[in-house]
């Protein structure tokens, strides 16, 4: 499946990203190759293979979920330029963002 430069530009605009025409062309080519690879994988016969089967021989190793004392809030907010009731205020980046 071919991804067009127009589609890349459309998604970039939705994401508030700007790309040069060269970058847009490169992204379109790269994304088309990725979609082609996924389409190729869809052709693999997985009959009888459990959905949770993996080819990797690894197990997920997670650390214990133990609560730890965090950093002092006032110390964290010491260098924050604009705050409101322990929320960091940042400029709105979306149109009609209001006071978000």
Curated annotation (Swiss-Prot):
One Pfam family, short name: GatC
Keyword annotations: ATP-binding, Ligase, Nucleotide-binding, Protein biosynthesis
Ligase as UniProt keyword: yes
EC number annotated for this UniProt entry: 6.3.5.-
PANTHER family (UniProt xref): GLUTAMYL-TRNA(GLN) AMIDOTRANSFERASE SUBUNIT C, MITOCHONDRIAL
Summary of the function given for this chain in its UniProt record: Allows the formation of correctly charged Asn-tRNA(Asn) or Gln-tRNA(Gln) through the transamidation of misacylated Asp-tRNA(Asn) or Glu-tRNA(Gln) in organisms which lack either or both of asparaginyl-tRNA or glutaminyl-tRNA synthetases. The reaction takes place in the presence of glutamine and ATP through an activated phospho-Asp-tRNA(Asn) or phospho-Glu-tRNA(Gln).
Family the UniProt entry places it in: Belongs to the GatC family.
Protein known as: Aspartyl/glutamyl-tRNA(Asn/Gln) amidotransferase subunit C
Organism: Streptococcus thermophilus (strain ATCC BAA-491 / LMD-9)
Taxonomic lineage from the root: Bacteria, Bacillati, Bacillota, Bacilli, Lactobacillales
Gene: gatC
């Amino acid at each position: 499946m071919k991804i067009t430069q127009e589609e890349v530009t459309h998604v970039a605009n939705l994401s508030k990203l700007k790309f040069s025409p060269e970058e847009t062309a490169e992204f379109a080519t790269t994304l088309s190759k990725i979609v082609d690879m996924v389409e190729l994988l869809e052709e693999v016969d997985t009959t009888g293979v459990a959905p949770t089967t993996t080819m990797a021989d690894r197990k997920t190793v997670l650390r214990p979920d133990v609560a730890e004392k965090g950093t002092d809030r006032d110390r964290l907010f010491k260098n924050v330029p604009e705050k409101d009731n322990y929320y960091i205020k940042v400029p709105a980046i979306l149109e009609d963002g209001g006071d978000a």
